[in-house]
């Protein structure tokens, strides 16, 4: 388990987010504990702009010319897309499940990715974990990352970690 850091400077993030990643038998299981959230979910519709609210995100690079982006909002809405040259392509899939549970001002997310259904090279799996905390009345999003990109976007592939 590890705490996410402030995405801009790498310091301790506030609010705190604890993440645990387990790679077992071709499934990646990611659990987030997102503390002290305003719990603002931008939409209840899957594959909408969930990042405009509070959300936990997981980026997965399997060595292709694209990478996957997975998101789960506090209300359980999910986002699954391929990102290639900063272009988002949504698609129907059966290899991802995401869920969220709220307790007071915290929410807990579980993501499960079945790598066998995607097709992958077990020697090349890269990833990064993120959280967006966004209060609708504030202009700035609070961005945190397992491996901070040190800028205003999470889409920095060379900051992905090896699993």
Regions found by a protein language model. Give the residues of each.
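Structural preference for beta-rich elements and adjacent junctions enriched in aromatics
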Residues: 1-163
